[in-house]
Amino acid sequence: MKLSFSIITALVAVASSAIAAPIDPEKATGSINFVVDYTISEFPEISNTDVAELTNGEAISLEYSVTNNEDKDISVVGVGGSFRDPANGNVKTNLTAAAVGPVLVAAGEKASFIQKIDLNLVADNYLLTPQIFVAVEEDLKFIQARGQLATVNDLPISLFNLQLLFLEAVLLATIGGILYFVYDIWGKRYIEGTAPIAKSSKKASSPSPVSVATGKAYNSEWIPEAHLKQKKSKKAY
């Protein structure tokens, strides 16, 4: 069976409306006897009653196993689904509908295929509800696979992560630039304005010469010699 472009286009349109609507397996499958099951290849030990521990930034692969119990051929043409709230079934995030194969499953036969899912969700608890789209003769139907409880966690951040180191370097450089700017505009002026002014030391003045007492109250050099002789002769008497 060869799918035309119009069928692929219809697949995407149906996926967008069907995924957002409440799950109604009876209405979706039209009561076709087509059994769908899957395992998560990264967690093969996880069963439908367990909780899968998933990590953001990684990808998981759903390995489908389908069995056609009808008396006519059925072709798997696409995959989709959603992550729902496990408490009330409301859709939190839709999975992008994507074309598959088509994978022809003859009457009474089995087949397998893989759906890859990139994880980029808000860390929370979810119910993973995959869907597959099948072409039955001229009809396009979707089949709701079982739900899988899952917890999505964020990837732990390493201190040696290159992106984190780059952001830290940018942050430190920015803070350093701001501090230098503040210091250059206000800090330097404040420090210069409050710094104590050093007093200049004065040179000690040389001591004045001390006059030696000679018993005279005046300098006799300017007195005429005759006057001095006269004064001495008076003292002799």
UniProtKB/Swiss-Prot annotation:
Lumenal-side positions: 21-161
All ranges on the Cytoplasmic side of the membrane: 183-237
Gene Ontology CC entries for this record: endoplasmic reticulum membrane
Range of residues in the leader sequence: 1-20
Pfam families, alphabetized: TRAP_alpha (PF03896)
Keyword check for Nucleotide-binding: no
Source superkingdom: Eukaryota
Keywords: Endoplasmic reticulum, Membrane, Signal, Transmembrane, Transmembrane helix
Cell compartment(s), UniProt: Endoplasmic reticulum membrane
Keyword Membrane: yes
Sequence intervals crossing the membrane: 162-182
Topology with respect to the bilayer: Single-pass type I membrane protein
Family membership noted in the UniProt record: Belongs to the IRC22 family.
Primary role: Is probably involved in a pathway contributing to genomic integrity.
Entry protein name: Increased recombination centers protein 22
Species name: Debaryomyces hansenii (strain ATCC 36239 / CBS 767 / BCRC 21394 / JCM 1990 / NBRC 0083 / IGC 2968)
